[in-house]
Every structure is written in structure tokens, then in C-alpha cells.
Amino acid sequence: MKYAHTTTGGMIMQITNGVQLHFMKTEKFKDIGISIRFRSELEPKLAASRSLLALMLCDRCKTYDTKKKMSDYLDLLYGATLNAQTAGYGSAQIVEIRSKIINPCYVQGKQQLLESLFSFLQEVLFQPLLQEHVLEESRSILKAKIERMEDDPAQYAITQGLKLAGEGDYLGISALGDVKTLMQLTLDDVKAAYQRMLEKDVIDILICGAFDDTQMEQLVKAHLPFAARKQEIKTFYKVQNQLHDERKTEYRNITQSSIMMVWFTNTAINDPDYYALRVANAMFGQYSTSLLFQEVREKNSLCYSIYSNLISYDAALGVTTGVEKEHIDKTISLIRKQFQ
């Protein structure tokens, strides 16, 4: 067993190759949070499969084979929660299973509460109900979520901006997947993604709250018996794209136009000048005192809000704002001027 202590007072231990356990001890909360994160390379088809899988895992399992049974059991655990999400971190996609439960010290005579929760998580992860009707229900939910994002002009501009700037690279891949790919997925695709996730993904188990280290370590080992894996999945990289001054315009019958601009910083999060870049971004467009806010909003009254954001894991920087269509060119010109 390998142990390491972080600068923030946490502890990291290696359970087996490719599986790490992170303890974040704090007395601030009256509950204990558990996060199980599966990390794999970000691929278009796999991203959609894993997004579906995340929904299916938290929907029902073989022991609790209906939504009601799942909900009723969580209620028995004093309102414990269970949810899942997918997210992109540079060249990787994370499937995160999260649960939260009241600390047993606040429940008289319920010291086995954590044992019950870990048994439940074991069922969820190792005995999922991957069936056709669950797939179709989850597909409908995920499709609606993606379409809602596309209906939002600001979010759509961001998505399309990243897709254009990251064409042929990880930056251009949505961690949720796209509707076309989603509708073509079969149950076998999801089952294959599940097996790959369980057997090959790099896994981080994070536990936050007030608890006994030894007891928690024993619970993790007993109920989350992940096998060793050799794969190493990196997250940060530098996007490689030869685009220069590319522009894409789409039209909708709406009052305000949304703008997304992307630059490649060529600075990864482990580069020596990364923190200098963060300071530069703060000055450029992260706060109300920044150049973008003062020049574009305050002095020229072209928009209500404007901000820049580092897309750190991809070595990129984005600027988003919404303006009247007659002010698009002037706004873009001012943004470029402040950037220079």
C-alpha cells in the first residue's frame, strides 16, 4: 500500500495499480461525500456510450430493479443521494458516480450506515440492470438534455466554437456525445463501454467528511474490489490545430447574437508559465475590473456581460458575450484589440 499526503492536508493511497483512494478530512459537514471517478480517453462514440451508461447505472440495478426501489432504499439510509455525471478534462472523459449520506455519528444506533451505503454502491457498480427499456429511457433523457443545450444560443455558440477550434482534436469532442451518435448506439455498445470502464479505466475514489481512516479503507476494499489496470490516462495536452482567423456564422430569429472566440495558449497546466497565464487571463476578462469588461461593456455599452475563461486542460482560452447583431463586428474588433 502506497500513501501520500497532499499540500491541503488530504491523503492519497494506492489501492492497486490504476486505483487510488483520496481522503479529504474535514469537520465542516454533517454528511460524508463519496465520489467514484472513472477516467478514460475522450472519444466521440465512447463519450456518448458512457454518458448513457452513467444515467443507466444510477437508474436501477438487479437488486433494486425499479426507480421506486432505488429511491426507497436511499430513503432508508436517511435520505442518502446517488447521482452521476460525465465531464471532459482535456484528452480525458470522466464518469463520476457520487453519493452523500449523513454522518453515522448523528444517527443513534446506526453505526452500520456506511456499510449499508457501500453495499448499495457495490450493487450499483457491479450488478447494473443494463436492459433495453432502461437504455431507451436514458437515451430519451440524454437526447433532451443535449437538445436543450443546443436551443440555448449562448451555450450553442460555445459548443460550436469549441467544435470548430478543436476540429480533429479532443477540444472539439463533446463529453456528453452528440444526438446523431446517441441515436445509433445499441445495448451492446453500452455493455462494451461498461466492461471497458470497469476493467481499464483509471479510477479515483474520493471521500470527504469526518470518518475513521481505517474503517473507510476497509469498506472501500471490501465493497469496491476493482482489479489492477495498467492504463495511464492523461488529461492535459496542448491542442494542435492550424486554424487561423476562422469564422463560422449561424442565423436564428432571436434578438441577441452570441459570440464565442477561442485562442490557443500553447501553455499546459504543468508549464512554468501557467500561473502567469492565469494572472493575464484575470486582467484580460475574468473580473469586472478586467480590460474586456471595462472597454466592451462599460465604455462602449455593447453587451451586458463578457468574460474570458481558460480552457486549461486543452491549452486554450475562450471569450463569450452576447451583443446586438449590428454590433458584432465592432465587438469582435474591440476584443481582439484588448487581447493584443
Short names for language-model regions:
Residues 9-33:
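N- or domain-start disorder-to-order transition segments that initiate the globular core
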Residues 30-50, 68-120, 155-180, 204-208, ...:
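M16 family metallopeptidases and their MPP-like homologs
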Residues 4-6:
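Short hydrophobic alpha-helical segments enriched in small aliphatic residues
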Residues 171, 175, 180-181, 199-268:
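An aromatic/glycine/proline-enriched structural segment found at the starts
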Residues 71, 120, 127-147, 234-241, ...:
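Acidic/histidine-enriched alpha-helical segments
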Residues 266-286:
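A conserved active-site cap/scaffold subdomain adjacent to cofactor or substrate pockets
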